């Protein structure tokens, strides 16, 4: 019975109609030469419930590396990244790589690696997945 309570709480918190989802991304609409647009002045709030992903485009040219970042809808971002997949060859001249992500500021600089943080997050994820499976199972019974 407690599982049903957890499922109801989960649904109440995350799946209510009208629940607004907004993400923050780095944005520089014009290509920036050797500037990856990852400083605070490039942070924007994306359009609620429309632009649910961050997009990053990296183009390697003879003059240097060009960056363009923006908010995007998941459909537009995934279509763009799939369309340019064959042109993505990091380190090669005229390479164009487009990537999409859906966590806050994920199109910014890569976080510095820490040895133990990745393994510390895994148990929480496993627990969350277990609770979701239990909730779904109890809902079908």
Swiss-Prot record:
Q: From the record, give the cysteines joined by S-S bonds.
A: 25-54, 28-37, 46-71, 77-100, 88-97, 101-106
The record's InterPro entries line, in alphabetical order, gives: LY6_UPA_recep-like (IPR016054), Snake_toxin-like_sf (IPR045860)
> In the UniProt record, does the keyword Lipoprotein occur?
yes
Record's GO cellular component terms: extracellular region; plasma membrane; side of membrane; synapse
| Main localization of the protein described in the UniProt heading | membrane
Task: Tell me which positions the record assigns to the signal sequence.
Answer: 1-20
List, in alphabetical order, the Gene Ontology terms for molecular function in this entry.
acetylcholine receptor binding; acetylcholine receptor inhibitor activity
Q: Which Pfam families match?
A: UPAR_LY6
Which superkingdom, per the lineage?
Eukaryota
Keywords tagged on the record: Cell membrane, Disulfide bond, Glycoprotein, GPI-anchor, Lipoprotein, Membrane, Signal
User: Quick one: where's the GPI-anchor amidated serine lipidation?
Assistant: 117
Which residue ranges does the record assign to the UPAR/Ly6 domain? 25-107
Glyco sites are at 45
Say what the protein does: Believed to act as a modulator of nicotinic acetylcholine receptors (nAChRs) activity. In vitro increases receptor desensitization and decreases affinity for ACh of alpha-4:beta-2-containing nAChRs. May play a role in the intracellular trafficking of alpha-4:beta-2 and alpha-7-containing nAChRs and may inhibit their expression at the cell surface. May be involved in the control of anxiety.
Spell out the protein name for this chain.
Ly6/PLAUR domain-containing protein 1
Q: Per the UniProt entry, what species is this protein from, by scientific name?
A: Homo sapiens
Q: Report which gene this protein is encoded by.
A: LYPD1
